[in-house]
Amino acid sequence: MTQTTAAVICGEKDIQLRTFELPSISADELLVKNISNSVCLSTYKAALLGSKHKRVPENIDEVPVITGHEYAGVIVEVGENLKDQFKAGDSFVLQPAMGLPTGYSAGYSYETFGGNATYSIIPKIAIDLGCVLPYDGSYYADASLAEPMSCIIGAFHASYHTTQFVYEHEMGIKEGGTLALLACAGPMGIGAIDYAINGPVKPRRIVVTDIDEDRLSRAESLIPVSAAKAQGIELIYVNTIEMEDPVTYLKSLNDDQGYDDVMVYAAVAQVLEQADALLGNDGCLNFFAGPTDKEFKVPFNFYNVHYESTHIVGTSGGSTGDMVESLELSAQGDINPSFMITHVGGLQAAPHTILNQLDIPGGKKLIYPHIDLPLTAIDNFASLAEQDPFFSELDAILAKNNYVWNQHAEKALLEFYDVSLSV
């Protein structure tokens, strides 16, 4: 039997670190060593609601569930019936969207299946559904971030357009069209900007809005206007915080026309109303952000639905194909999901990080379950140099890369904490 330590949901707003023995795996299961897990806002929502959340079981006070679903690692033990599919020592990345009628998924619903743990067991149902993907790379953060990137990619694929009297949807954002990304300078927004510029379908103009100047400045430093121009795309960053009439201004950037595609990255009524007003003929509003209020409602212009063919779509999660696309684009160097990461920590940081996501500034938080490190901003490792000179070395690695987390930094960190990637 293998001992694991995990961050588990025990009740509403109650996440604890617990150490316990994992059962022996069955012939149809995998025992895995979790190397990295990126923290998702959806986990905060599950922790906030506890058993009131659709994906969280009723009996978590007796059988807590492991948090975390954006994870990657190394296979330690393979069930007898799976030895023709997997082998110990192989790296994997989890695709958590199983699509079960119950909504159950890794990181929400299982006692032994989740990312914020040193070891976990991947059950038969996840394996049968093809949710364990081989990972040929050696940068585990990239693998973890394939899940959030798949959500972004899935949203771009789910948007659609129409031709009058042709009764087929043309899936995806409009090639050569105009794209407005609203409230889009947060971590997922940065991933969306990156994909919009470097993905397979390219608009001719992208306008990114936010109300936080620091976030906009960071987004522009990571993805400059010149990078978009090299792809034949006009990229414009806009802070709308003090604008009396942002809709008129944003339309003025688009030849006084509405946009072909508008994506919304915050569940804020005012932003959605702006999005509706920004739609052009056959414009698609993609509501990416997930609200927590089940009664969240916003007025929508149905005159334009009828006469201008405006329409709306929303997605939650991404498919296996979306995840594979993310891994391929990352491996080719076309996109860099690590732009989203601003903090790194060990497993002991997971409970506080999950429960306080809304109050911790920055982007994605990355947990390495086998290291002993408080949650640390990646531009602040120099402050730990008094504890150990290694952190000065790590800061130097990051400084050379515009303080973007990267494979070199990950390798150095795992080696410092003696994290073995072999079994």
Swiss-Prot record:
Induction remarks: Induced by mannitol.
EC number: 1.1.1.17
Cofactor: Zn(2+)
Catalytic reactions on record: D-mannitol 1-phosphate + NAD(+) = beta-D-fructose 6-phosphate + NADH + H(+)
Mutant lacking the gene: phenotype: Deletion mutant cannot grow in minimal medium. Mutant fails to persist in the squid.
Keyword terms of this UniProt record: Metal-binding, NAD, Oxidoreductase, Zinc
Key word Transmembrane helix present: no
InterPro entries registered for this protein in UniProt: ADH-like_C, ADH-like_N, GroES-like_sf, NAD(P)-bd_dom_sf, Zn_alcohol_dh
Pfam families, A to Z: ADH_N, ADH_zinc_N
Enzyme class: oxidoreductase
SUPFAM superfamilies hit by this protein: GroES-like, NAD(P)-binding Rossmann-fold domains
Top-level lineage group: Bacteria
Sequence positions that bind Zn(2+): 40, 69-70
CDD domains per UniProt: sorbose_phosphate_red
Gene Ontology MF terms: mannitol-1-phosphate 5-dehydrogenase activity; metal ion binding
Gene3D superfamilies xrefs: Medium-chain alcohol dehydrogenases, catalytic domain, NAD(P)-binding Rossmann-like Domain
Signal peptide region: none
PANTHER family associated with the record: L-THREONINE 3-DEHYDROGENASE (PTHR43401:SF2)
Record's function text: Seems to be involved in mannitol utilization. Complements an E.coli mtlD deletion mutant.
Family under the similarity heading: Belongs to the zinc-containing alcohol dehydrogenase family.
Protein name: Mannitol-1-phosphate 5-dehydrogenase
Species this chain originates from: Aliivibrio fischeri (strain ATCC 700601 / ES114) (Vibrio fischeri)
